[in-house]
């Protein structure tokens, strides 16, 4: 099939996370199907180093992610752990951070 794409999650190149315009220190990503031009929809892999914080942001659509490893703490103190599938609905706002 010529319209098939296979991504091996253990063999990808991560680039600085620049979805907010400029790179966020400690964050990197690998775009799989993400396209900012279509409203920022699609899939990507995101890595956050220890002691890293995302910028506070508003979601125009759904944001969904699977915690593959580690822990992520949201602005309200909720801790997302390995195996958690998290959904933020449209118009939700938040930021998240990692500890050591």
Residue ranges and their predicted role:
Residues 1-40:
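A short, N-terminal "cap"/entry segment at the start of jelly-roll beta-barrel domains
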Residues 44-46, 54-59, 76-78, 96-98:
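Short histidine-centered beta-strand/loop micro-motifs
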